[in-house]
Each structure stands twice: as C-alpha cells, then as structure tokens.
Amino acid sequence: NKVPYNIYGGTQDDATVYGPADEWNNSFNEKWKYLWIDAWDGGDGCITRVDPNDNNTVYFSLQNGALRRKNMLSGISVSIKPKLPMIINDNLNYNFITPYFISNHDSNTLYHAGNYVFKSTDRGDSWKLISNNLINSSDKPSFSAGALAESKLEKGLLYYGSDRGSFWVSKNDGISWEERSEKIGNGYIRSIEPSKFNKSVVYMSMTGINYDDLNSYLYVSDNYGKNWKKLQGNLPNEPINFIREDENFEDILYAGLYRGLYVSLDRGKSWNILGKNLPMSSVSDMEVHKSTNDMIISTHGRGIYKFNLNPLHKYYLKQENISDELLFSDMEMVLPRFNDTHKEPLMDTYQKVPISFKLNSKKNY
C-alpha cells in the first residue's frame, strides 16, 4: 500500500532485490536494495511474497526449497523450510525454483511443494504434510513440483504440476489428490492459473526447454483438469513460461514466452504481442498491482518492466461495445522533485503523467 509501492525480484547470482515502482533516474541516489545477499557468491533469488496485510512481513526463497520469512522492521529473517515427518522414510526433492504461495483466503496460511505438498497456518513456524509423494505418477514419473496454485474462488481447491507433466488436483485442501494428466505433454509445468471467474476453469502452461523441446504447450480445462484443450492459437511456437488471467475481465489472458509478452482479448483464440518497447527476451513472471492496475513483468537478463493496464481495458471495452464512449481518468499532477544537491528541482520529473485524448477521424489535424 506504499506510494510508490515496492517491487521485489529474484536475480541470477545477485540475490533478491526490491525498490520503488518509479522510473529509474540517475539524478538521484539508487533506491533499490537487497532483500538478502550471500556474502560469498551473491546467491540466486527465486520467489518473493509480501504479506497482503502486513508490508513488513516478506517471504523469499532460494534455490532447492530454501524458504525464509523476514521482518522488514528488524531486518531479521528466519528459515521456515518444511521437513518430512520422522515417520516417513523418503527423500524430499526440490527443483531449483520451488513453488510456494500465501493463501488467497488467509494471509497466515502458506503452501509449499516439492515432491510432497506442505501447508502452514502460522506463517511457516510449523508445517503439515498434505499429500503423498506426487511424483509417483502412473505414466509420468517426475522429480519434483514445477507449479502449485489455489483457487481464489474456493478455499482448499489446489492444483499441483510436476516437472514431467503430471497434473494433480485436490478439492479438499490436500486430504485427497487425483491425477489428471491425460492428453497433455510431458514437459515442465511452469504455471497453473485457476480462473478468477469460474471455479471449474483452470489454465496451465508447460515448457520443454529443459529437455531440448522448444515447442509451446498451453492448455485450458473447464472441469478441474479432467479434460484439456490446447490454447496456443496463433502464438509463436516457442517455450511458454506462464499464463495469467486478467484481474477484471475473463476474456483477457496474458502469456509470457521465451521471446516476449502476449495478450489475448478472446480467451486464447488469438494473440498479439504486448508492449512495443519491451525487449524480445524471456518473460519469466508477472504480477498485477491492483490499486494502480499496473502490470509488472520480469525478464531473464533485461530487468523488470511496468505497464499500466487501463488503456488496454478501455480498448477491450470499446471493442466489445460495452461502453459507447471511452472514459479517461483524471490526470494526477506531481510536483517536481529536488535532486540530491537540494539546490534545484528536477523539472523533468520521472513520475510521468499519462495524457489520453480522442481524435475525430472525420477531420484533418
């Protein structure tokens, strides 16, 4: 809820960083900081989650299942990586990037997955095992989890995807799991997106790049994964890192590919590239800051980018004839900032003001 809000991102060999959602400007001191860093080799940053009810509680993961909770006021972090109960004589496997998340229904509840799925209701202080060894697929034996998700519409509706294409669903918060992997590929399931509008709909993407397969694999199911339909449409045939559903409109989907970000306004029937000045690099992840409607995306090697979704939403409404006129929001004026010398204001403020206008096509300008 800060203004500007903070963006968190994991890097390769340079730990995890965070900073304000402002455009970078070299007239000011660098505002980005390390959330953590290994003093010897930097370390690899993976997934960062912020408690939605407490900005001072931040979770961050390192490679191979390591997970920590940090108090931003004290600067102290503690390890909260789950362990198998002593009575289970088995190995706990993790991929380099381990899926975990804060429940949409309770900010004290966490889920964390390797070849087993764990649940905590006390912010990671203790964990409960809520699955069997899910890599023991009937025909897709795997090593560990690639993706884990919970429905925003139904508490305890969980989805699990492995690194070899096995897909599991639990409708009772892990009490029982059912495999639903038929007629999908054998790739690394990187992204599972339960619909925000229909609880039986779930999207899933997988990549074969780990196995020298550069094809695209994108699916949708309208019955909790029992049956799958391919959703590639006219997307380039290249690895897909994630699939996301828009926060406000169920027809709008976003896909992060090996070379670029794509958007669909018709639920995957057709796709267009999004962001004309975005480098053609691998788009690895995406989040939406709800109060500003900003999309934040991460790339591999080309940094973090921010894109406001309001113009896209207005275009979609106009295309669907939902609104007769485009309504543009009022401009928010921002005072110039003083630079670090405190002698003169920086008139070309980096807090840009969007200007929207409409031209009458019947006239010449």
Model-derived features with residue positions:
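Contiguous beta-strand segments within globular domains
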Residues: 337-364
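Beta-propeller blade termini and top-face loops
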Residues: 1-325, 330-333
